[in-house]
Amino acid sequence: MYFPIFLAKKYDILALCDLDEKLFKNITPILIPHYHKDFKKNIKKLVDKNIYFIIVLNFKRLGYPTINDIENDLINDVLKDYTNYSLAYWTYNDTSKLEIQNFINQNGNLEKSIIHREEFSKAQYLSNQNFKYHIFIENYVNQDYIDLFVSNDRIYIQDGFKRQKKNADYPKISDFSDNHYTYKSRGGVGFGDFTIIGHDLKDGGGAAYAVAIHMTNARKKIANVHHFVSDSIAGRENPGGKFIEALNHMIRFIDNNAVFEGIGINTYRDLHKRKHFPGLPINKKLGIINHIEQIANIM
């Protein structure tokens, strides 16, 4: 089972909604709620498609909804009559046993998981609880800690996207992960990542000097990300022209190499044929769609 993690923002949710529904037999999105004007509307899109997902209750970052916010605006509102989801709690170095106990005791009708973002001091206590999954972000917790937990509910998350400060700095290709190939041999029941966004989960961005298309290409043993960058890398003007430059590089690569083509790639092909710039948020959405399709294709 594949567990991609991302912010529940407009284009991230739209990427999920645009995927072939059959893929969700093997995919469980983990969503970090994010306040914006379409907050509830976006979650409702997943409800309307009956997509199973996991909601993170306690992502501690300024401006993000609190546990009470999520209770009031989602669990007791948009999700009041929806049962096809579960909850997860994100551990920090200062997470207390009382917090975990409160998480366990509340919303008793919903299954619950723990996301180990930082190592919890009372690991044995966590291991003894009846959680659906123990989800480990491997970049931040070590194997000795992971080994304290039983293997029949482990999910291994790796942040494979190597974010650069500037689009112009991306190499032509970078390794992403072999997690999809190795997780079972390490006793996992699932694996995941932060798609092509990365664990940094930036809240926004402005016009870039260079435009980049990040295209995942997954094979049996490893997934790579190809970075197609516009030829023009100076100034913030003409993002549409820069997108077409990057798209030309991408299509040329696809035409000459073996790449699985799903909805994401086919949409890029259509944009190339029409020489159309859909906007940078759509470029992001298509990159997420392709990433998930690529991973699903080799599972």
Describe the function of each predicted region.
Residues 37-41, 94-102, 120-126:
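Active-site-adjacent beta->alpha loops and helix N-cap segments on the catalytic face
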Residues 3-7, 30-33, 52-59, 85-95, ...:
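Catalytic beta/alpha-barrel core
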Residues 249-299:
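Hydrophobic, glycine-enriched assembly/anchoring segments
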Residues 127-266:
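Long, charge-rich C-terminal accessory regions
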Residues 16, 29:
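Conserved, mostly hydrophobic/aromatic
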Residues 45-108:
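A broadly used, surface-exposed interaction patch
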Residues 63-72, 120-128, 145:
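Leucine-rich repeat
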